[in-house]
Amino acid sequence: MALRRCADERVRRPATSAGWASVRAHLIAVLTFIAQLQACLSYPAIPVTGRLANTPISTTVDSVLAKDYLPGSSSHIAKSGNAAERIARFEARFGDRPLDWVTFKKISEATSPDFATIYFIKRCLSDHTNERVQAGYSREVERVKSLIHQRHWAQTIQSSLRGYKILFIPGFHYLSDPTSGADFLNQRTLMRQLGLNVQLAVTEEDGTIEENAEIIARIVRSESRYHSKIIVVSTSKAGPETALALGRLLRPSETTSVRAWISVGGLIRGTLLADRVVTWPKSWIFRVIFSHEKIEFRSLPGLTTSASRARMNSIRLPQHILVVQYVAAPLSGDIAGDVRARYSYLRKYGPNDGLTLLADELVPGGVTIIEPGFDHFYRDPEINLKSLAVANLVADELDDRSALQK
């Protein structure tokens, strides 16, 4: 009964700290100030209902064309010939373009950011593997929810997951601000109560990408001596740190125990908000602000888009590691009030989650799970049970792939 009460509390705890989210409030406040300098907060808000990524949607979008494009909406079903032809032209024009920020910036400029976000989701799920995994994720979420409702806690964990150690890589200032969710406390506690082997990697909370990647590499080497099956889970800033550790610092032979890497809202190719922080003359202003808030400025240059894209281009992840990116893909009506300024600033660059461009979260060769309806901070009351669903799904996927190789 004690286990049941504790687990119930963990699953149902309101996600005000954004369970999977990973950025300290002080840093966010600074980046919000940057965004507000030039952000235009005004854009259309057209009510719409429909479905995205197997999920019911009720929100607002920024253009009639986006409303027409949303699957399951009345506008989508009854769209005019002109709208259908225009959408078909865009799909044909961009259908063979890479899923990168350049493509989605062009789509946004020609249509609207919400249209581009819907196109991003559709393109991701047009991949057979992504479509299959997304469907599996939806089913697993419903299975876990049903078992929780019935209080069958032990059954929420798939047997395949129990054979893995789960190594969580925390986000920015996870020690100074435990309310941010950057330390995965809710997920770790719930999973531990359900009998899973979990560990938090102790990284430098405001260290550089390179410094923390070295720490992660050392931890993986050490844990690999005792565990042959490890799933690594990172969030936000820890995403590029993990990629660097697994894809450059460690030799492929040193990563054989790492079976999967789950990147949650990963700043894989940085954030344009960091670009503004490190650019003169703003850089000296923010050095003073950061010093006052006791935040290390030195970690930010590594989060710029130029540094991050160059770094990622030099990384080669071992093929045996299953990479899964869990991407929040909000429409404009899904953005929380305290995120709207950053989102609005980034809109001119294309679909974004309020901290980074959606395309910049993608890891080459990775499997994508879309979470529509939420911004970068995943303020979803069900985020903790969804974390179980993602972990279960990844373990099952690993088992299926292993069986096919035999």
Model-derived features: where do they sit?
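N-terminal secretory signal peptides that target proteins for export/translocation
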Residues: 1-20
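Bacterial N-terminal signal peptides
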Residues: 28-38
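Flexible, membrane-associating and regulatory peripheral segments of lipid-active enzymes
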Residues: 40-179
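C-terminal catalytic-base region of ester-bond hydrolases, centering on the histidine
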Residues: 46-84, 318-406
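Active-site catalytic motif of lipid deacylating hydrolases and related acyltransferases
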Residues: 157-230
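Solvent-exposed loop/turn segments at secondary-structure junctions
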Residues: 172-175, 205-207, 236-240, 266-270, ...
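Short aromatic-enriched loop/helix-cap "lid" or pocket-rim segments at secondary-structure transitions
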Residues: 180, 271-277, 334-339
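Serine-dependent carboxylesterase/thioesterase catalytic core
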Residues: 214-312
